[in-house]
């Protein structure tokens, strides 16, 4: 089964349309399980991560883990106030993007639409704080104070209401592409690996809670105990006003990470494979931790030899995250190739 941008884009859309903020990944888990079930038995860890062995391999061969995080950023209701909802962030969110954003409140009685709002500057007092901060924002539910108090409660989860859209040049924009596009790349690689049946054992981990600490990756790595692992996440793509030395172009290929927490030999092996097989590659050196699940996986159990592949993404942690599916396809191709060429 060949790896195509069309299949990856379709998988990414399906995953992005399933809500799954950190710690509440159930709907996203179900969508991912549907995509992975044809390749092997899907198991759920106690922390809500997904594990699936897609190739048993030969006895004594290395065990490779392919990982991406399933959770997304979101919000949690902190207080119901006169029909409006006060809320806090789940994960890192740029508050400047939030005013007038449509959201969905996932309450006990069902899902309800809302709009993020605030007191208009021209109606606020002269001494009011007009800056865009989470504590200055509310969610307008449209309900009366009495009805809202019955429907909503502190602890309810909120996600962006937007769905992925296709831009020119087949690029995708929308919420949750961090890291559902990484999940789609891992699933595409898994399909290829399951069909080719290489010598090494290959397990897929789609982890929970990356945006709040990486607990799903750490426990998933401990459970699976691989020899090697490739974490797939997103990193800063180019955009208007962004320094080119701090970003990588969309469409330029997967970003290979270099960091003290990553295994140098394994990383260079992937670099060589990409160069020998004309897979576009960009380079992302980091002086310390990577800020991804690779850091937690590296120290799981007895330790795992890690590599990191990142897909360039614009407007990170917003409702309009933007990627080029071809970068995800090349990420998947490199992972599949790594299983065929050995370690």
Tell where the protein language model's regions lie, with residue ranges.
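N-terminal hydrophobic/helix-forming segments and targeting peptides
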Residues: 1-343
């Amino acid at each position: 089964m060949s790896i195509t941008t069309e299949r990856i884009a379709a998988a990414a859309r399906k995953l992005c349309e399933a809500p799954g903020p950190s710690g509440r990944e159930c709907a996203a888990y179900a969508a991912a399980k549907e995509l992975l079930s044809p390749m092997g038995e899907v198991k759920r860890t106690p922390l809500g991560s997904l594990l699936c062995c897609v190739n048993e391999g030969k006895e004594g061969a290395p065990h490779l883990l392919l990982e991406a995080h399933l959770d997304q950023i979101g919000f949690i209701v902190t207080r119901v106030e006169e029909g409006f909802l006060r809320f806090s962030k789940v994960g890192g969110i740029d508050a400047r993007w939030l005013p007038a954003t449509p959201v969905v409140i996932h309450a006990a009685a069902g899902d309800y639409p809302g709009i993020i709002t605030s007191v208009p500057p021209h109606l606020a007092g002269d001494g009011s704080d007009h800056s865009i901060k989470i504590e200055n924002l509310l969610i307008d539910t449209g309900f009366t104070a009495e009805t809202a108090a019955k429907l909503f409660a502190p602890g309810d989860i909120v996600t962006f209401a937007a769905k992925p859209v296709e831009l020119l040049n087949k690029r995708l924009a929308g919420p949750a592409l961090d890291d559902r596009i990484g999940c789609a790349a891992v699933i595409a690689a898994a399909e290829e690996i399951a069909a080719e049946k290489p010598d090494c054992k290959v397990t897929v981990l789609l982890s929970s809670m990356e945006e709040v600490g990486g607990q799903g990756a750490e426990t998933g790595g401990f459970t699976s105990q691989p020899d090697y692992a490739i974490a797939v996440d997103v990193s800063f793509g180019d955009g208007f006003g962004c320094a080119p030395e701090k970003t990588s172009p969309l469409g330029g290929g997967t970003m290979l990470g270099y960091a003290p927490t990553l295994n140098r030999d394994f990383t260079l092996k992937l670099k060589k494979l990409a160069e020998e097989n004309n897979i576009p590659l960009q380079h992302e050196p980091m002086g310390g931790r990577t800020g991804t699940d690779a850091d937690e996986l590296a120290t799981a159990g007895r330790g795992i030899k890690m590599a990191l592949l990142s897909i360039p993404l614009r407007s990170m942690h917003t409702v309009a995250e933007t990627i080029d599916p071809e970068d995800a396809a090349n990420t998947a191709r490199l992972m599949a190739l790594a299983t065929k060429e050995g370690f």
